[in-house]
Amino acid sequence: MNKLKLIFAGTPDFAARHLAALLSSDHEVVAVYTQPDKPAGRGQKLTASPVKELALAHNLPVYQPASLRKEEAQAELAALGADLMVVVAYGLILPKAVLDTPRLGCINVHGSLLPRWRGAAPIQRSIWAGDAETGVTIMQMDVGLDTGAMIRKVSCPIAADETSASLYDKLAGLGPQALVDTVNAMAAGNTAAEAQDDAQANYAEKLSKEEARIDWSMEAVAIERCTRAFNPWPISWFEVAGQTVKVWQAEVVAQDHGQAAGTLLKADKQGIDIATGKGVLRLLTLQPPGKKAMSVTDLLNSRRDWFEPGTQLN
């Protein structure tokens, strides 16, 4: 097997786990690209990405262009003489000039079984849609958005209690080995890519805070999936007594209620039951303003007046 010279491009922890796998492989990472440092935390201090921190710990050259569209940035990348560029949650668009620069092109690790859930939020959208399985796809990049030919797929089930946080960890465990296997196969000239069927594609749009507002007219099953899809961000929420309350955990209670959607049916140590468009949603772990997430029992000890039966939410 030939030893390949790699450029790695990525930004969050998910990407850093893939970089770590490449650093333990037989190949040479000659440079790392990541997004510019950004303000974070209460002090809004400029903070390096997890990928940058890992790269610096391994004394790798780090490049942080605001864009790869400029000729200077493209020339700088070409001068690295890489055989292959590996892209994982980088966050910048790669123009055709960059895609064509490495001898073997650019490959991308995507958190879904393409062509399902192209786009920015595949993990969250797969949970929200009630998919039974998802996985990781490694594709040869082209100028489209997650439209490239697929080199390798690894699947995993989505558990009934899966959150975006837990599924993120699952895929971050699956992806690195699949990536190393793919790079090894490319080094040996032993890969075949399968074109995506555009007719089977759908799009995983980026999440918004407003989208996380609970619509009680939806079915309880769908709302419960939302609470898991939006955990750990932006967290599903509703308003009561003029306050915003976040929902970290809920469950579906299979019962008919005969009440208007959004009606509070009961509140006790078992949970807070809310009528929905179909079925009942039982709220289990909530976060009131300025507090940490807490059990319903703890919240009712201090705010029972918010949750009187018959109260209409939203």
Swiss-Prot record:
Keywords: Protein biosynthesis, Transferase. The keyword Protein biosynthesis applies. InterPro entries: Fmt, Formyl_trans_C, Formyl_trans_C_sf, Formyl_transf_N, Formyl_transf_N_sf, Formyl_transferase-like_C_sf, GART_AS, Met-tRNA-FMT_C. Its EC number is 2.1.2.9. It catalyses: L-methionyl-tRNA(fMet) + (6R)-10-formyltetrahydrofolate = N-formyl-L-methionyl-tRNA(fMet) + (6S)-5,6,7,8-tetrahydrofolate + H(+). One of its GO terms (cellular component) is cytosol. Coiled coil: none annotated. It comes from the Bacteria. It is an enzyme of class 2 (transferase). (6S)-5,6,7,8-tetrahydrofolate binds at residues 112-115. GO terms for molecular function: methionyl-tRNA formyltransferase activity. Attaches a formyl group to the free amino group of methionyl-tRNA(fMet). The formyl group appears to play a dual role in the initiator identity of N-formylmethionyl-tRNA by promoting its recognition by IF2 and preventing the misappropriation of this tRNA by the elongation apparatus. Belongs to the Fmt family. PANTHER family: METHIONYL-TRNA FORMYLTRANSFERASE (PTHR11138), METHIONYL-TRNA FORMYLTRANSFERASE, MITOCHONDRIAL (PTHR11138:SF5). HAMAP family: Formyl_trans. This is Methionyl-tRNA formyltransferase. It comes from Aeromonas hydrophila subsp. hydrophila (strain ATCC 7966 / DSM 30187 / BCRC 13018 / CCUG 14551 / JCM 1027 / KCTC 2358 / NCIMB 9240 / NCTC 8049).
